[in-house]
C-alpha cells in the first residue's frame, strides 16, 4: 500500500512486537506507515491506531 511519509505529531510513542513490546519514543510515522502490529499512542496514553 502507498502511504505518506509525514510524521503524525499526535503520536507520542509506539510499541511494536519486533521491539519486544518496549516503548519507542521520538517516532516519525503515521497510522498508515506504521509496521504491522505496532500500536501508536497519544501523549495521554490512549491508543490512536495499530499498524496493519
Curated annotation (Swiss-Prot):
- Function statement: Potent inhibitor of trypsin and a weaker inhibitor of chymotrypsin. It does not inhibit elastase and subtilisin DY.
UniProt source species: Capsicum annuum (Capsicum pepper)
What this protein is called in its record is Proteinase inhibitor PSI-1.2
Q: What is the lineage of its organism?
A: Eukaryota, Viridiplantae, Streptophyta, Embryophyta, Tracheophyta
List UniProt keywords, sorted A-Z.
Disulfide bond, Protease inhibitor, Serine protease inhibitor
Which SUPFAM superfamilies does its entry note?
Answer: Plant proteinase inhibitors
Q: Which family does it belong to?
A: Belongs to the protease inhibitor I20 (potato type II proteinase inhibitor) family.
Disulfide linkage: 3-32, 7-28, 16-38, 31-49
Classify the source by domain of life: Eukaryota
Q: Known InterPro entries for this protein?
A: Prot_inh_I20, Protease_inhibitor_I20
Annotated GO molecular function terms are: serine-type endopeptidase inhibitor activity
Name the Pfam families on file.
Prot_inhib_II
Amino acid at each position: 500500500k502507498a502511504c505518506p511519509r509525514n510524521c503524525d505529531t499526535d503520536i507520542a510513542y509506539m510499541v511494536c512486537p519486533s521491539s519486544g513490546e518496549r516503548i519507542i519514543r521520538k517516532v516519525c510515522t503515521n497510522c498508515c506507515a506504521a509496521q504491522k502490529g505496532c500500536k501508536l499512542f497519544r501523549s495521554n496514553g490512549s491508543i490512536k491506531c495499530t499498524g496493519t
